[in-house]
């Protein structure tokens, strides 16, 4: 018979609550969300990314609307795990986002190969390249969120690295 005490021994615990994922790109920012149980990640929208203050405003609105327990942001790394100019740009973007949505925590998670995987998935499902541009960032955000959820499900700890708000 399963009791709360026995359930603890069954493995790591995952926090309950909706999360948002953000895939930051130069032109577009993909956003995804999950259900409160962290089972299914779904696309939310693509936010225009060239006007960074406007993008931050829209992301703050989405955080207010979805009320997530945290926001995970994909951190682009090289295949060897290093960070280049794109990662530095995402770190700056994420720092500003974290300030704007505090006290909601923001975490950076490895996003290696998510856009490639999303692109392959869209092509396999018959999405044409022109239409795909408008949803590729959302699809990448879904993959980022699914990976973050799986990481927490396995480890029982929040995924990636926390972003400290520097004022």
Curated annotation (Swiss-Prot):
Its EC number is 3.1.-.-. GO terms for molecular function: nuclease activity. Disulfide bonds: none annotated. GO terms for biological process: rRNA 5'-end processing. It is found in: Cytoplasm. The keyword Transferase does not apply. Belongs to the YqgF nuclease family. Could be a nuclease involved in processing of the 5'-end of pre-16S rRNA. NCBIfam families: RNAse_H_YqgF. This is Putative pre-16S rRNA nuclease.
